[in-house]
Amino acid sequence: MRLIPLNRAEQVGAWSAQHIVNRINAFNPTADRPFVLGLPTGGTPLNTYKKLIELHKAGEVSFKNVVTFNMDEYVGLPADHPESYRTFMHENFFNHIDIQPENINLLNGNAEDHEAECQRYEDKIKSYGRINLFMGGVGNDGHIAFNEPASSLSSRTRIKTLTEDTRIANSRFFGGDMNLVPEYSLTIGVGTLLDSEEIMILITGHNKGLALQAAVEGSVNHLWTVSALQLHPKSVIVCDEPSTQELKVKTVKYFQQLEAKNMEGF
């Protein structure tokens, strides 16, 4: 596992965006051989999306031959609801780049048959072989996507009940009213994530400190979903200084020295 310990959240956004651009350009995707990118929602990746849009407008990257799969979606929230993840992705990213609409893949939280919808999503991912790079965030309790604590580390795309902590955290997007936050979601599984060629997780803010500690210094534990990254051959965590407060000083220094050249310019 790699750890990129930067100073500020803005640097996390810049580094992660450049990493995605580098991966896409090195892959040199075509219509018949697209680059497959997994994407999250939430506050943490906003800096990354802003930087990706900036790099796209500067001619540094094209998303014409990029296929995307989003991590999750609320169940029962209308697709055009301002807090649906479909709306989030279009407003904050898709509407500002040259991605082809048919290459955007989002879970349908209003499907009549949730199990069939989840299987459709898994099958669609497999039709491309695998996801080349999956970017994600992490919750205070270490959840990735909506894989809450105690999720199976071999789980696939499925419907999940949201914990009270997650609903309270997400209530900030619903006027502070937890009762307006849906109780269920469709989410990729931990196993789905681990099937990706590469995983990049963004962690910012002091409130994510325990999750980062569990990911880097803890043991693999289904109560900390993020610890599953230790099982992946090509995972990278990009974090800011406030999120490292629970890590040992020598751990941070080790990765600062190890990744010094890769952090130059950020």
Curated annotation (Swiss-Prot):
Q: Which Gene3D superfamilies match?
A: 3.40.50.1360
- What name does the UniProt record give this protein? Glucosamine-6-phosphate deaminase
PROSITE patterns (UniProt xref): GLC_GALNAC_ISOMERASE
Q: Do you know which InterPro entries this protein is assigned to?
A: Glc/Gal-6P_isomerase, Glucosamine6P_isomerase, Glucosamine6P_isomerase_CS, NagB/RpiA_transferase-like
Primary role: Catalyzes the reversible isomerization-deamination of glucosamine 6-phosphate (GlcN6P) to form fructose 6-phosphate (Fru6P) and ammonium ion.
Q: Which GO terms describe its cellular component?
A: cytoplasm
Name residues in a coiled coil. Answer: none
